[in-house]
Amino acid sequence: MKTVSIIGGTGYTGSELLRLLSTHEKVEVLNVTSRKEAGKKLTDFHPQVRNLRNYNDLEFQNIAPEDIDTDIVFCATPHGASMAIVPILHEKGINIIDLSGDYRFEDIEMYESWYGLKHTGKIESAVYGLPELHREKIKKSKTIANPGCYPTGAILSMAPLVANDLVDERIIFDSKSGVSGAGVEASQTTHFPNVNENLGAYKITKHRHSPEIGKELEYLGNKKLKVSFTPHLLPVTRGILTTAHSYLKEDVSRADVIEIYEEFYDGEFFVRIFEEGMVSLTGVRGTNFCDIGGFEIDQHGRIVVVSAIDNLVKGASGQAIQNMNIIMGFDEKMGLSVGGMRP
């Protein structure tokens, strides 16, 4: 049995890690850290995992990274905090999955520009952890940068078309997310009366996930792209629906496009291609699946692809566990083989 620590266990991603790991056959959570809640019972803060595994016996701890000695560490800390922790764990040879944005960019200047932070802990061997595109690199690394929630759904929705050079450089992503994507701390934007029965765009052209989407698709297609991304906040708890638009470079049919997607994602358990019907948030809620559908082509040659993920699972904690499974040589589906909660 491999041992796990969760650094930053009071947020939504930490909570979701606990829920999902409760069914994992080959790992046990030993430490869950929180400076603010240190000494408090884990299940008093997260009652949803009461009576599962050893969770009733755990308390939040304030442990320095130097004192952590488990096989795996999930770093569920805010952007900027991870860069002070990950290098210490890396030196100790611990397997790390970092859920912040601190290690998603090889180009440090790009990170500093979009996140407004000075990066002080670069690790050359860190790998961007989108398994469907980088599985072989993930297998060889001990430090994984878990992708952002919006980029996961966006990249997977367009990857087959970009990889096959079927669309021009203009790609537009319109994404709508549940409120949990904003994190556990309440704000004026996420306050219930302001979100309920409402829908609004935010950071219309300057969301920090934009360059993450762009650099991954440019790497895949080996060319410069003009990627545009606009997020919206939905009055729902969890889920991201992404509508991706681009223009085809050649005359292909909808059937051709579907065949390309099915071939590209052949063998990928967590990507489900919908030839008919429409993908939905309820279909992926609580799961590590990315559902992709639409594939409609209009009279101008514009192709529209729609993806759906759970922002807390495939967009965060589930994908982190998927990455852990790959690193440790476990069955990739372990702890993640559940269907959506529909209705």
Swiss-Prot record:
It catalyses: N-acetyl-L-glutamate 5-semialdehyde + phosphate + NADP(+) = N-acetyl-L-glutamyl 5-phosphate + NADPH + H(+). The active site is at C149. This is N-acetyl-gamma-glutamyl-phosphate reductase. One of its GO terms (molecular function) is NAD binding. Pathway: Amino-acid biosynthesis; L-arginine biosynthesis; N(2)-acetyl-L-ornithine from L-glutamate: step 3/4. Belongs to the NAGSA dehydrogenase family. Type 1 subfamily. Its main location: cytoplasm. SUPFAM superfamilies: Glyceraldehyde-3-phosphate dehydrogenase-like, C-terminal domain, NAD(P)-binding Rossmann-fold domains. It holds the Pfam family Semialdhyde_dh. Catalyzes the NADPH-dependent reduction of N-acetyl-5-glutamyl phosphate to yield N-acetyl-L-glutamate 5-semialdehyde. InterPro entries: AGPR_AS (IPR023013), AGPR_type-1 (IPR000706), NAD(P)-bd_dom_sf (IPR036291), NAGSA_dehydrogenase (IPR050085), Semialdehyde_DH_NAD-bd (IPR000534). NCBIfam families: argC (TIGR01850). The keyword NADP applies. One of its GO terms (cellular component) is cytoplasm. SMART domains: Semialdhyde_dh (SM00859). It is found in: Cytoplasm. Keywords: Amino-acid biosynthesis, Arginine biosynthesis, Cytoplasm, NADP, Oxidoreductase. The gene is argC.
